[in-house]
Amino acid sequence: MEQKKRSSFSSRIGFVLAAAGSAVGLGNLWRFPYLAARYGGGIFLLVYLILALTFGFSLMITEIAIGRKTRLSCIGAYKALDKRFGFLGWLAAFVPFIITPYYCVIGGWVMKYLFTFISGNALEAADNGGFFSNFIGYDAGSLSSTIFSLNGPTPWFILFVLATTIVVIFGVEKGIEKASRIMMPILAILAVVIAIYSLTIPGAMQGLKYYILPDFSQFSVSTVLGAMGQMFYSMSLAMGIMITYGSYMQKENLLEHSVTQIEIFDTLFAFVAGLMIIPAVIAFNGGDPSQVNSGPGLMFITLPMVFDSMKFGTIIGAVFFLLVLFAALTSSISLMETLVSVLMDKAHMKRKTATIAITASCLIIGMLSCLGYGPWATITIIGMQFLDFFDFISNSVLMPIVALLTCILIGHVVGTKVIADEVKEGAGSFHREKLHRVMVRWVAPVMLAAILASELATKVFHLFTI
């Protein structure tokens, strides 16, 4: 009965756009350009492309096939494959439970910056970090005044959560698929427009050469680990999203072809994000690629200053933050949908009830990250603010563990033939079956263990050196 009642995307392109929208997020915009600049530009791009076509493809098609085969959310899907791995479904579901609240907080920051640029106050945002620090660290003296002030992050966080909720509550076809069909083409067009404009800035060609041309002398193990980590996080793997979206995929759709389209879109967007950002930032900093920083510092401090130095910078900045808003929304929608799907499957809730429940929990938990740089800044967990801690636990610990255990389950317990048979059901063939078998059984587990060890070693080293 569950399979008959389960919602589905109306077409393959609807599924591809929704899944690509999940993959295309803030990581593409603020982490990929930084890593490309740090690890030699062109050589990083080359390594990233190779890994996306092998490592990323194998993990993504595995998760989507699991979802389509079982027609269940991640908790039920893993248990359906092997009852001993039922715990893995809960672990996978816990990842978006942690990520969704703080991701919506950052989405609220984006809304604030978009409003700032649209209202003609872009100069305020270009003050080398002062505007950003005052905004996320806003403290009006009393908690109620801080929460309800537009000068602080909380109202913007709430607004972003509600925007995400509205899409999810309408369901798969009328909500997620329809929103993806609108936002993804606009996202692509805006990215190309900004990239083209960025390349017209005086001095941008030097940054373009650094970004495009491979320098093999800069190739190292760190380059591979950096590209592997970015590709892993970028593709929305190991958080139940692709399993959930796979469960909405129609059986007659070509699974391998769809995954190829998703990875092409995600990789192209990451590449264009680099074109938007790296040449402009390098030109702004007099040709120094080391000044391309990562995370919020790049998006909310460096780029507003770059826009301020441009002709028509206010307009370009507004267009950029609109692009970022769409990218953040398509990702937050997939995160929330994963949790809603779990409640619908396990607690037998109706979509509306499940969405309201997840929204409420998101607002409550997200308040920790929202106020973690302001009134609650003195409260830390192992030396980290709430948002940084949630990001570390989800991205650096849980996601590699979930992906590693998934590879063990598929590669050494139930067998890769389970995935291959599901892929062939819609197409009759699986062109990269041998690659998939080798990657999932042997190569991917080693890579994932390396990512986990690298992240933990970096954090432990940091803790003992502060």
Can you name each region flagged by the protein language model?
Residues 347-359, 391-448:
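C-terminal membrane-solvent junction of multi-pass transporters and transport-like membrane proteins
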Residues 36-62, 88, 152, 398-400:
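Extracellular loop-to-transmembrane helix junctions
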Residues 3-6, 34-39, 69-91, 105-169, ...:
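Inter-helical loop and helix-membrane interface segments of multi-pass membrane transporters/permeases
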Residues 11-51, 246, 257-260, 264-267, ...:
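Transmembrane helix-boundary motif of multi-pass solute transporters/channels
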Residues 8, 14, 154, 265-271, ...:
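Loop-to-transmembrane helix boundary motifs in multi-pass membrane proteins
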Residues 14-15, 19-20, 49, 90-93, ...:
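Transmembrane alpha-helical segments of multi-pass small-molecule transport proteins
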Residues 1-30, 59-64, 68-80, 84-90, ...:
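Membrane-interface "cap" regions at the ends of multi-pass membrane proteins
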